[in-house]
């Protein structure tokens, strides 16, 4: 009897030790009820579990297909589960021999990452054109919003502690307005569910969203100047990337929209190469070249001394010319008040981003869906001849005279220019005060709002033709 008792005691202790050391299945916060998984792909799923055990994954859109993954010695596992065309609601089961996690109300559709600073973070509660109507109209059960809390970290994090919400008026009014309008226009056009993952923090520089080693490896980024100018925000290199972006990059999403740049205006000269480096670093970590579309910063009375805002806009255009799978949305005409750095007319910004995506990535829109950008400048007699992209159907001025165009001679002194639109949709720029023209610029300052558009209604992007 005593031997049996000792044997039972021994076995119970073994069982207790096993139970105490067992690690149940766990998933990062982006895998949760109400989520959207990217459709028609192999979607990455990962998490934690008991070392050396087998984890099985079953999506109810394909219940007969079970995906297996082995937990490594560090307690981590990762798998890819095939997804079908858009639909739902579905469930996703993740389990081993002991524990199970069941995610409910999952939709298959298109997923986009939305990031940047305050104009991306800006909610209807902060201010929005036609706010009450837009909020009341925001009952969209097939739009889901993943909110990433604003947190910084000096080390890479595995989770961002975010939350998925179904889009309701109550949710919409406290989430990114641009992300919502972008998602809504995508949903209406593609007729599929859309998930947007919003990781944004007002007042932050691009350096904070870039991996630390990228910033530290290039002395030209000169982060110390930003830290001196704006000491009250999380300005250190990589701290927002570590906590708010890095955990999301393994997730399978369609692409990224980005609205940032205002905080970098005091150090604009290396912003282009910084952004290019940031985009490439995100893509390397994700293991794929996902599309990346920017919003050009809006006109605002910065009262800058070194033309920093104009140089940021120029750098944003440079990024699109030198980085594959990128695009740029110009929103100068969406500004109602140049004394506010946060324009409240967010609907057209979201729609323009969506139209660019629909045309360039999904290829479901024909025609022109982006702003004209300067392609070429030639000198002919006493005039400059300017050629633009995206003006095949015409370039127009919405007023009697074109605003914001200036011309200079060899002395580099700019004066107001006269402009004629010729039959080739080129601009002829001249001034009786400039006998030998060498350069022109258009809205190349803090806050001038131009009035040149292509026939499709997109504003001509600000530019300069020569650097003095």
List each language-model region with its residue ranges.
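Bacterial Sec-dependent N-terminal signal peptides
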Residues: 1-22
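Cell-envelope and extracellular/periplasmic
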Residues: 20-468
